[in-house]
Amino acid sequence: MPRNLVLFDLEWNIGYQPYTFNYHGVQQTFRGEIVEIGAVKIDEDANVLDTFSIHLKPRIFRKLQHHIAKVTGLTQADLDRGEPIVQGLRRFMQWCGPDAEFAEWGM
């Protein structure tokens, strides 16, 4: 059976201050949130089959941090027009398909 390999990269916006909240009695701290997903689907011979890119609208860190804009090329308008994360993740998973294997690019 041919492999369906998805190489993906996440871009994150960070807050100027961490965001801490109580979730079902457990203290949680967010330092950033995903604002873009980029991906390439390749076959077992490394042929590019398809590409995917989506901007996500942040819920917590809504203002694009200057350094993130500089590094990624994203704009505040990209984030403002982005899809809600749940909807965006659903679209990404549908694009990946049920037999996808994943590899992440990041540092």
Region roles according to the model:
Residues 2-107:
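Conserved non-catalytic scaffold segment of RNase H-like nuclease domains
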